[in-house]
Amino acid sequence: EIPAAQPSWVHLDYGNPESARWLLQTPLLNDAARESLLGQSNRPKLVRMGETVLLILRGINHNKDHRPEEMVALRIYITPDFILSSRRRSLLSEKDVFQQLVLGGGAISSADWLVEICDALTDRAGEFVEELHDQILELEEIVLMRELPANGRLARIRKQLIMIRRYLSPQRDLVARLANEKLSWLDEDDRRCLLDIADRLRRWLDDLDAGVARSAVLADEINNLTAEATNRRAYQMSVMALMFLPASFLTGLFGINLGGIPGAESPTAFWVFCGSLLALATGLAVWLKYRRWW
């Protein structure tokens, strides 16, 4: 039973069969509202029906065994005196708003609740964007030290940047549009708050764009470092091969089993040959060092 004397908020997990059945059977909703609250679409969306608004907003996923960029859809049906929201996975933002209500300092109207939930979703998104920013700074410091970061770390951060931006961009437009809707239950203070939230989302989007650009530069630097390391190893192997090439030639030449090889009858010929190889290797090393090849 929904109280009629004051604004009410009903929050459901539509993955629960009982909640889904209630949403399908309640006379409070029309077919469009049911489809919105139970549908599969996850993109931010705003549909106005008179003084009623249907919203789909997205929040950062903090659930265990899920990645943050797998954003959670919060579906909202809101009227001047009634709010119905549903989601499949929990959101910290909804808990923030609920906690404020429990403490007695939360929303007192549908408009206040709408501003608070948009604000909470934006704050949580901003926290995650700042975390990504810090991770990029850490990678930049590693690369500046001419070291290679852990394999796949940059690719994961870049993917998160792109996916978060994919949902925050339409959500920014949605909040700005919501502030301009001529709804009787939204006053000027509420509209200013929503426009401020849209502006904060725009700043987070700018940070995400900058993060994508910086990650591209980092990828180039990491590729350059990898190429340099590969070239350095190949060069070292080439120098080693150059040093052993004369020795390989001489050992092959003197190793043939033919008569008339110089020193074949001398007991000291082997040591003389080893000394000659050592002198040749030393001379070649000095020459390479002089030519700055080594």
Regions found by a protein language model. Name each.
Residues 202-294:
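Hydrophobic alpha-helical transmembrane segments and their immediately adjacent juxtamembrane loops
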